[in-house]
């Protein structure tokens, strides 16, 4: 997804890389009543977001950036590799209709967690594997899930599990990118429970 030249996007020129207290603070947004947030980094957020859109009980998804040192980064800033941000999807889910465990299962199935700072052809720290938790229960479930999956893997899982930090919503162009048609204008289904293969194209 590193296609800055094709999209006409680049670094905003932000040179002050002193850690921002805002960027390193907690995510202070509030989910809807009866809902909870979760954050996952699993490579390019386009395909990851579509996968979570299809989960029954997921009420909202947003592509964005987190875990960095710069306040309000642009896509260009993040792709420069100098801000420390990860591309993530923030998922809002109904606690009565969706379990955190089901979100974790989808997370593991969507990417190779044994590659460091890379998913397929996408290379950079922004593509690292990460689970960013909002509650002690989420942390507990995430760590238990990692341990179970590690037993099934020959290579070491590189996924980081950290507290959720400030979430920066990505530019509108990136939101629900594949369901809106992507580069070729061919929208992909967001129907709940849909198992159609996800085609990620820029």
Swiss-Prot record:
Highest taxon of the lineage: Eukaryota
GO CC, one annotated term: cytosol
GO biological process: one example: response to light stimulus
Reactions accelerated catalytically: L-methionyl-[protein] + [thioredoxin]-disulfide + H2O = L-methionyl-(S)-S-oxide-[protein] + [thioredoxin]-dithiol; [thioredoxin]-disulfide + L-methionine + H2O = L-methionine (S)-S-oxide + [thioredoxin]-dithiol
Induction: By light in etiolated seedlings (at protein level).
Compartments, record wording: Cytoplasm, Cytosol
Tissues where this protein is expressed: Expressed in rosette and cauline leaves, and at lower levels in roots, stems and flowers (at protein level).
Annotated signal sequence range: none
Top class in the EC scheme: oxidoreductase
GO molecular function, one term: peptide-methionine (S)-S-oxide reductase activity
EC assignment: 1.8.4.11
Family matches, as PANTHER family: MITOCHONDRIAL PEPTIDE METHIONINE SULFOXIDE REDUCTASE, PEPTIDE METHIONINE SULFOXIDE REDUCTASE A3
NCBIfam families (alphabetical): msrA
Protein name from the UniProt record: Peptide methionine sulfoxide reductase A3
């Amino acid at each position: 997804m590193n296609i800055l030249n094709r999209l006409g996007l680049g670094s905003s020129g932000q040179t002050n890389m002193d850690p921002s207290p805002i960027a390193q603070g907690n995510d202070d947004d509030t989910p809807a009543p009866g809902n909870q947030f979760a954050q996952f980094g699993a490579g390019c957020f386009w395909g990851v977001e579509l996968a979570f859109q299809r989960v029954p009980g997921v009420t909202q998804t947003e592509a964005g950036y987190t875990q960095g040192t710069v306040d309000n980064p642009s896509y260009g800033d993040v792709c420069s590799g100098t801000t420390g941000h990860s591309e993530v999807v923030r998922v809002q889910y109904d606690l009565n209709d969706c379990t955190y465990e089901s979100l974790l299962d989808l997370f593991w199935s969507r990417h190779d967690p044994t590659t460091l700072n890379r998913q397929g052809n996408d290379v950079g720290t922004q593509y690292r594997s990460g689970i960013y938790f909002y509650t002690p229960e989420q942390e507990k479930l995430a760590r238990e899930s990692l341990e179970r999956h590690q037993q099934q893997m020959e290579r070491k899982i590189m996924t980081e599990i950290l507290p959720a930090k400030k979430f920066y919503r990505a530019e509108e162009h990136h939101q629900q990118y594949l369901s809106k048609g992507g580069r070729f204008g061919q929208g992909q289904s967001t129907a709940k429970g849909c198992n159609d293969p996800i085609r990620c194209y820029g």
